[in-house]
UniProtKB/Swiss-Prot annotation:
Compartment(s): Nucleus, Nucleolus; Nucleus, Nucleoplasm
Compositionally biased spans, kind Low complexity: 61-73
Protein name listed in UniProt: Ribosome biogenesis protein BOP1 homolog
Gene3D superfamilies to which the protein is assigned, alphabetical: YVTN repeat-like/Quinoprotein amine dehydrogenase (2.130.10.10)
Repeat region (WD), residues: 462-502, 504-544, 581-623, 626-664, 667-706, 710-749, 766-797
Origin organism lineage: Eukaryota, Viridiplantae, Chlorophyta, core chlorophytes, Chlorophyceae
Native source species: Chlamydomonas reinhardtii
Biological process annotations from GO: maturation of 5.8S rRNA from tricistronic rRNA transcript (SSU-rRNA, 5.8S rRNA, LSU-rRNA); maturation of LSU-rRNA from tricistronic rRNA transcript (SSU-rRNA, 5.8S rRNA, LSU-rRNA)
Principal location: nucleus
Compositionally biased intervals (Gly residues): 90-112
Pfam families noted in UniProt: BOP1NT, WD40
């Protein structure tokens, strides 16, 4: 209890620091001269800062000596001490709880013993965390003589700023009786007096039952103590409990105190010469460069050994002859012994042999009758190949003693020895798959990948037969070009759905395309054996004049086609055009990005299946003397001199600058039907008759990166968007599949392909034909579709 009281006293001193500089003040009082407190008791006067100023520098050694001897101090020192008595909260009138003043302590003799205390030392120790006051009070409590003398003439430490407003006297109901026996107040209703002289009434104590209930209900009951001097219950903190335990164990109250500090032998340790050398300049560069002189010596030794000038001694030759060739374990790890290699779980070469499989329920010697094979099953087992049939058939025996020896025991052991001897061992990492959903790649949700076309917005009706091909203008997307089996070429206004112009041609239109050159505004169409070039009439006057000049024939033309004027004019309703007549029916067209070259594909043309035409020179040429396979589609690379030729089984990539085959993309099992290039030029979409759409990454491999099979019928067309990460495929099942295809600039990141929308219900399947073509709007996330039901539909976001 003394220790806990000391801890609490130190904590109170630490919480309420004095407001004036502390000075050493020592007085001696005896229990006989102390009268019980009452209304007439002398109360401490208010703090006077000038008192501490007067007592600065006074020596209190005499007072300390007088207190120890039990005599009074000299008069002059007593006067000084009387002035110090009113100095402030550090005076004797505030009781032992504040670390100042003097009182009585029960000693071994049974009566009150004189107590001598230095207020400055105790309070200064309290400001350092309470450890000094707690230690001194504890030492005083355990002294055999029972007396307490803690005046070590230590230098006082300056307290807080005198101008501070904080003071311990402001604490209400503060007990100022001092460290006197509480038995004096045993029969009184009060315990001490406050700073105003009023009695401090005792608090109502709890009975035993209430104390027992509080101890069971509260977790803080075991570390709650009763302070009899202030008549209150105090809960000790964890730090204070640790301090009490350390004091009881005879240790320092605080862990920060190190009784065995490291001794520094500055300039006396002989090792200091190594740490602090006399010369500490940086190492020269020559220390880090191989020595040339050592290299010359090594070269001389090597030359002498090669020429036989340096020979081994007879003793060395005899030792090598006796040792023989070095022997080592072939399958052991380098640098490891046999035991270490056997114990190494992650060895480089050693892998323990797999254990034999334990017998299961199928090897039971007396299985149920329904598990025994019939005669037909036995005959089938005997006729089957030994590698495909089970090792043994179930048999029934009356007891385990009747089971004969296993006939294939030696054979199986021999095969196991062969496996251990010849077959390499491989560690297979087992996949920790908790659920099948972990095998499915985590794709983003479609609503997070918007915008993409979702809703049918407009229908363009006017064709009298199936629409074979469509193409929006590549600049503004204001106009849409379409060609159908009814022999008409129509130009539509996208926003209104009005047919702005119609050309009636000689036969069915199989393909349409715009010239990419913005200053011409030409349209092209494949009609039978001809490729027709017509002015669109949608541009300004300068574009119309440039188109008329481009369509003027300057020469007879040469190469694989015959350039004529007036052919389309005879079958057109307005305007003059230009036609390139070929030998075989044309099925598709492809323009170069600059708008001067375009290629036509005639699948039945054999050696003239692919013809490249130049508009500025009116020339046509056949780039291939021999085609390996039937050509289906062609395309120009948007930025590089590459030419893509899709046959029924492969996609060949030719370098036009080197006139050589650059790459060959391998197809699947189906016949290729459509082709599309990514605007970046590094990715290719190919549709085939096996209902698949293959995505090729030219920088990754010649095999498909992804094979998408979402259609129930062969795809007829594929298309990329020019500005949005979208691509689509149209098939004969009447649906259009829209995908999110993000291509990253980082070559180490694979493209992200996510199906986002299925556009269905717009087209009707007619004669096993559904959607014939699809094309994206050049600037908006819209898509145009053309079907065999003579409809052209626009889907918007």
């Amino acid at each position: 209890m003394h220790i806990i009281s000391a801890i609490y006293s130190a904590r109170v001193q630490n919480c309420a620091a004095p407001t004036q500089p502390l000075v050493p003040s020592c007085q001696t009082h005896s229990a006989a001269s102390h009268t019980p407190p009452g209304p007439s008791a002398r109360l401490p006067s208010p703090a006077r800062p000038e008192a501490s100023t007067r007592t600065q520098g006074k020596s209190h050694a005499g007072a300390a000596a007088a207190a120890v001897e039990g005599t009074a101090a000299p008069e002059d020192e007593a006067a000084d001490n009387s002035s110090e008595e009113d100095a402030g909260p550090g005076s004797h009138g505030e009781g032992a709880g504040e670390g100042g003043g003097s009182g009585t302590w029960p000693g071994n003799g049974g009566g009150p013993q004189p107590i001598h205390r230095c207020a400055g030392s105790v309070v200064a120790g309290a400001t350092r965390g309470g450890c000094v006051a707690a230690t001194r009070l504890y030492l005083a409590a355990v002294q055999p003589s029972g007396g307490l003398s803690i005046c070590a003439n230590t230098k006082p430490r300056a307290g807080p700023d005198p101008g501070s407003d904080s003071s311990e006297d402001e604490r209400p109901n503060r007990n100022t009786v001092g460290n006197v026996p509480l038995v004096w107040y045993k029969d009184e209703e009060h315990i001490g007096y406050d700073i105003e002289g009023a009695r401090i009434t005792k608090a109502q104590r709890k009975d035993r039952l209430q104390q027992l209930l509080d101890r069971n209900d509260s977790k803080k009951a075991l570390r709650t103590i009763y302070d009899p001097y202030n008549d209150e219950e105090v809960t000790l903190s964890k730090e204070e409990l640790a301090m009490v335990m350390r004091i009881r164990a005879g240790q320092f109250p605080h862990l920060e105190v190190n009784p065995h500090e490291t001794e520094h032998t500055w300039f006396t340790d002989p090792r200091d010469a190594e740490v602090m050398p006399i010369v500490d300049r940086p190492e020269p560069k020559s220390r880090f460069v191989p020595s040339k002189w050592e290299e010359q010596k090594i070269v001389k030794l090597v030359r002498a050994i090669r020429k036989g000038w340096i020979k081994k001694t007879p003793e060395q030759e005899e030792e090598e002859r006796a040792a023989g060739p070095p022997a080592y374990l072939l399958w052991a790890d380098d640098g490891l012994t046999d035991e270490a290699a056997a114990k190494a779980g992650s060895g480089l070469t050693y892998i323990p042999a797999p254990k034999l499989q334990l017998p299961g329920h199928a090897d039971s010697y007396n299985p149920p009758a329904e598990y025994l094979p019939t005669e037909e099953e036995v005959a089938a087992w005997q006729m089957a190949d030994p590698e495909d049939r089970p090792k043994a058939l179930p048999q029934a025996f009356t007891s385990l003693r009747a089971v004969p020896a296993y006939t294939d025991f030696i054979k199986e052991r021999f095969e196991r020895c062969l496996d251990l001897y010849l077959c390499p061992r491989v560690r297979r990492k087992r996949l920790d798959i908790k659920s099948p959903e972990q095998l499915v790649p985590q794709l983003p949700k479609p609503r997070d990948l918007q915008p993409f076309p979702t809703t049918l917005a407009l229908a363009y009706e006017g064709h009298m037969g199936p629409v074979a091909s469509i193409a929006p203008d590549p600049w503004t997307g204001q106009w849409l070009l379409s060609g159908g089996q009814d022999g008409t070429l129509r130009l539509w206004e996208v926003r209104t759905g009005r047919c702005w112009r119609t050309w009636v041609l000689e036969g069915p239109v199989s393909a349409v395309a715009w010239c990419p050159q913005a200053g011409l505004r030409l349209v092209s169409a494949a009609v039978g054996n001809c490729v027709v070039l017509l002015p669109s009439g949608t541009g300004p006057e300068e574009a119309e004049e440039a188109a008329a000049e481009a369509l003027r024939v300057r020469g007879p033309g040469r190469g694989g086609g015959r350039w004529v004027r007036g052919g389309p004019e005879e079958a057109s309703s307005s305007g003059a055009g230009l036609a390139v007549r070929l030998r075989f029916p044309v099925r598709s067209l492809a323009w170069h990005g600059r708008g001067d070259y375009f290629a036509s594909v005639a699948p039945t043309g054999n050696t003239q299946a692919v013809v490249v035409h130049q508009l500025s020179k009116r020339a046509s040429q056949n780039p291939f003397r021999k085609n390996r396979g039937r050509v289906v589609r062609v395309a120009f690379h948007p930025t590089k001199p590459f030419f893509f030729v899709a046959t029924q089984n492969h996609v060949r990539v030719y370098n036009l600058a080197k006139q050589a085959l650059a790459k060959k993309l391998l197809g699947g099992g189906g016949v290729l039907s459509c082709l599309a290039l990514h605007p970046g030029g590094d990715h290719v979409l190919v549709g085939s008759d096996d209902k698949r759409v293959a995505w090729y990454d030219l920088d990754l491999s010649t095999k498909p990166y992804k094979a998408l099979r979402y259609h129930s019928a062969p795809p007829r067309a594929v298309a990329f968007h020019r500005s949005y990460p979208l691509f689509a495929s149209a098939a004969d099942d009447g649906t259009v599949q829209v995908f999110h295809g993000m291509v990253y600039a980082d070559l180490l990141t694979n493209p992200l392909i996510v199906p986002v929308k299925i556009l269905r219900g717009g087209h009707t399947v007619t004669a096993s034909e559904g959607v014939a073509d699809c094309a994206f709007h050049p600037t908006q996330p819209w898509i145009f579709t053309a079907g065999a039901d003579s409809k052209i539909l626009l889907y918007c976001n």
